[in-house]
Design a protein with these regions (language model features):
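N-terminal Rossmann-like NAD(P) cofactor-binding subdomain of oxidoreductases
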Residues: 1-213, 231-234, 306-308, 343-345
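Conserved active-site and cofactor/substrate-binding residues in soluble primary-metabolism enzymes
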Residues: 25, 135, 159-166, 213-221, ...
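Short beta-strand or tight-loop elements
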Residues: 136, 237, 299-301
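Short Gly/Pro-enriched turn/cap motifs at secondary-structure boundaries
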Residues: 210-214, 246-247, 291-295
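C-terminal substrate-binding/catalytic lobe of Rossmann-fold NAD(P)-dependent dehydrogenases
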Residues: 215-285
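C-terminal active-site/capping subdomain that shapes the small-molecule cofactor and substrate pocket
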Residues: 254-346
């Protein structure tokens, strides 16, 4: 197995990639992005349920002709990179196996996102490979690019946390967030391919409804990462997070209502966000409210900060399958391999 050396791909040799779990929405998109990436070679795609089928039969729009196989870690040879698109719990053993083979890994599940093991166990159950937690890097490049560059295991963020953290990070870093209410809305693809009755056409069409308004698994992820960048003694005292399912296939909007610790003007608020994101190629600061359609099929996040009547309000939109999952995985992988982070996703 090839050892992790940087940069891979810049000498003309493509990094060889396996996508494990390529039949879900995020896994299939990841496979397509790798397939079309100039510095990556997609050598294998796997499925736990649809082996023997070519991916382009399940997703004709992607045009990936490789046949889905059953994952056989012992049989992998000369593979540099693993992208794991398994559900939480099922992903960790696969990640551990790939790391044992010397592969660098981007994991799309929640298994390595949380630093605090008891918090993980509270929301997801027992962890099969907790020893890997300390070496995992949270893969939000706009938050911790330097750590991503040096990482060998990336915990790709959740879709809601990606949008919410990007929306709120400048305020958190300034120690300004006292209390925040996050009203989030996501397309149906965010629930995954096997969503069941709750995400069926009959249920979601012409309908908007909250789900898991208390105890949603993404709340501790958002809170942990924002408090990690907050000054000592100026963490977030209270957070309410309520997601909603809206009748669109993909896209995500978060509206964040922030009680700030000290008054701030609109000019100062915009300057705070410009100082934080002015050099970020995938973050666009807006003067008008953004919509889901503005970022569909892109790795972009559009943000509008506003001083409202009683609170600071921050809107952010992403494509939940792209920046919220698969294209962010490629952004992370580009950085890990010493490539320009926009290759294959710009």
């Amino acid at each position: 197995m090839a050892e992790h050396t940087q940069p891979i791909g810049l000498d003309g040799a493509k990094a060889r990639v396996i996508v494990a779990g390529a039949t879900g929405y995020a896994g299939a998109l990841a496979a397509n992005l790798v397939w079309n990436h100039p510095a990556l070679e997609l050598v294998e795609i796997t499925s736990r349920s649809e082996t023997g089928t070519a991916l382009n039969e399940l997703y004709p729009r992607y045009g990936v002709p490789l046949e889905l196989k059953e994952l056989d870690l012992a049989g992998l040879e000369n593979v540099d990179v693993g992208i794991v698109a398994y559900p939480h719990g099922a992903a960790a053993p696969v990640v551990a196996g790939m790391r044992g083979l010397g592969m660098i890994v981007v994991d799309l599940s929640a298994d390595f996102r949380l630093d605090d093991l008891p918090t993980y166990e509270k929301f997801y159950g027992a962890h099969s490979d907790p020893d890997l937690l300390d070496g995992a890097v949270y893969g939000l490049p706009e938050l911790n690019r330097a750590d991503v560059i040096d990482a060998e295991l990336i915990a790709n963020p959740g879709c809601y946390p990606t949008a919410a953290i990007l929306a709120l990070a400048p305020l958190a870093e300034a120690g300004l967030i006292d209390d925040v209410v996050i009203d989030a809305k996501s397309g149906v693809s965010g629930a995954g391919r096997g969503g069941g009755e709750g995400t069926s056409f009959v249920t979601v069409t012409e309908n908007v409804a909250p789900y898991k308004p208390a105890g949603h698994r993404h709340r501790p992820e958002i809170l942990e990462k924002l408090n990690k960048v907050s000054p000592d003694g100026a963490g977030i005292d209270s957070m309410t997070f309520v997601p909603h399912l809206v009748p669109v296939d993909q896209g995500e909007l978060v509206s964040c209502y922030v009680k700030v610790r000290e008054e701030i003007s609109q000019d100062a608020l915009e300057a705070l966000y410009e100082a934080r994101y002015g050099g970020e190629r995938f973050v666009t600061l807006r003067k008008t409210p953004p919509g889901m359609r503005d970022v569909r099929g892109t790795n972009e996040c559009h943000i509008m900060p506003l001083v409202g009547d009683d609170r600071v309000v921050v809107f952010a939109v992403i494509d939940n399958l792209w920046k919220g999952a698969s294209s962010q995985a490629i952004q992370n992988l580009n950085l890990m391999l010493g490539l320009d982070e926009g290759v294959g996703i710009s």
